[in-house]
Amino acid sequence: MILPTAYTGLNQLGYVTRDIEEARSTFERHYGIADFFCFEARTEAIIPKGSVNELIVGLAYAGDIQVELIQPVGGDVGLYADVLGEPQALVGFHHVGVMVAGNLDAWNRHRQQFDPAHPVVLEGAVGDDIRFAFTDERPRLGHYIEHVWFSARQAADLEESIPRF
């Protein structure tokens, strides 16, 4: 069971796109989000072991909610690309994001909640500063949940970089 306290950190809506530039344009035209902090990400996963994914990621805030655009570009990206379905779909809803506050021990305690009813389909780390895991909630909710933890330094760096609208 994932405890209700996990959702106190609900802060993100994640979307997958075939074309991040076109998705950015769509979000600007229709939702007033005029800029995204974009970067390329390559991560080697802990689960599934050795899996590598390459993504272009864009982040922006709409009020207190972070909007994430993800363009899969290489490696094992089925977890992301599968939500697009129709060839003409530009953007597909992928996940809600939950930020785990506190130190690394808080992440480890949070991580212990996951069980077979909430399988981890992707998990990884970036050095000592980032931990993330996606649980598959599609049978009940129709989407994934991304659980993420940042060191205080990483969180501060990101906050400075991500535009707010």
Features from the language model and the residues they span:
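Residues embedded in well-ordered beta-strands within globular domains across many folds
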Residues: G14, F37, G97, V148-W149
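N-terminal beta-strand motif that seeds the catalytic metal site of vicinal oxygen chelate
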Residues: M1-E21, V91-V100, E160-F165
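N-terminal strand-loop-strand beta-hairpin
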Residues: M1, Y15, H30-A62
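Vicinal oxygen chelate
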Residues: M1-L3, Y15, D19-E22, H30, A34-D35, A62-I65, E68-Q71, N108-F165, ...
